[in-house]
Amino acid sequence: MAIAVGHFHDVEPPDVRGRHCRLHSVAQLDSPLLDRDNHREHSDAGGGAGHTGLSPRRRSQSSPCFTTVAAPAGGADHRPPPESSGKMPRVEVVAGRHARGVRELIAEAAAAIASGTRLVPAQGGLGGALLLTGSRAGEHVAVIKPLGDDTAAAGYESKAVLREVAAFLLDHGGFASVEPTALIKISRPVAAPMTTTTTVASIQRFVAHEYDAGELGPSRFSVASVHRVGILDVRLLNIDRHAGNILVKNPPSSSRMQQPLDLVPIDHGLCLPEQLDDPYFEWLHWPQSSLPFSDDELAYVASLDPFRDAETLRAELPALEEPAIRILMLCTIFLKRAAAAGLCLADIGDMMTREFTAQEEEGLSTFEALCKDAHDAVHPPSLLPCPPPDGDGVGEGTATSSSGGRKHVSFGDLSVAEWEAFLERFEQLLPAALDAKKRAASS
């Protein structure tokens, strides 16, 4: 079976031409595999093991994903014959088309499929992810995770895959080493005349690795890598950064024991929740997190523009809910102010993380308490209690709810004017909280 691939504005990557294939069609696309479990969200990211070390609430519901698109070699005329052109499945790059490394990723996937490789289920994890192997034995190009049918394609029903793409789009210049990721829509004809089925998937470059962070001690990791992953997690309010979704990048064989190891973050399906929640930062108590940011890291944080990032997400991922985008803006502002005030990554993460009281009940984090005060100042809470959020907070709630003495704040209930007033009030409250944290850390 062949598959048609959407153009990158008629740009053909040179490396694909060199392999005598181009991005117009591919062979050996396994429809049964792509059709399987479209509505489920899985956690096997980057082909890594299914290690989580966490309760079911903490398990990642998504994974970095890879899509198969390619074009076999042919004669001088690469176009399909007229009688088959109407029956070819089509692949469209829905989001991330122009982002760093996406065109190259699609080209490599195309070349791999053209060379005769097939999709195979990934080993380990919660299942559902598909590996695209390269032309050399044991080499993986990408992981594919189908995520929806026609309904999901139209409405982006699976929000986890949107967050995977969002994390990549927000990793400017590859600062945190998020691998190239794009959103793909695959349309395939079925037996009924003039009928097609549509599958949505995300595609992400496979990360070559031998270990995840849970299999090595943190002393082996470079300070820069820990800081960069942490900066990304703070911006995204990642509630699922456990050791199993931090991969340890393979160093050159000649220097395996001579230099700190770099990290690659995967599995971002539980970042950017739609209401404030308790993040999980595996790196929080690593020694690197207590070291000051470098000048380059401070410059990067200072350069972040939360309002421009918000516009990027609205343009590329219009189905991502506005409360999630506002979480990004808020967390980025918090990160910028905290870093400028001289706080280290561990201090920033600690302010965002809830503590357990003597009665083993979660209390508000410092960050949440600031947000609650600012929210209540511009939008007084309702006297009627709302049911508590279900699970991880992703895709939950557009209002402030109360239960058991604790509030879960979302910003979907704020008008544009109220949101602007909230940010203004938040920034008024923030300096005193940052000063208090600095005094506590130095005492």
Question: How would you label these PLM feature ranges?
Answer:
Residues 1-239, 243-443:
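ATP-dependent kinase catalytic cores of phosphoinositide-metabolizing enzymes
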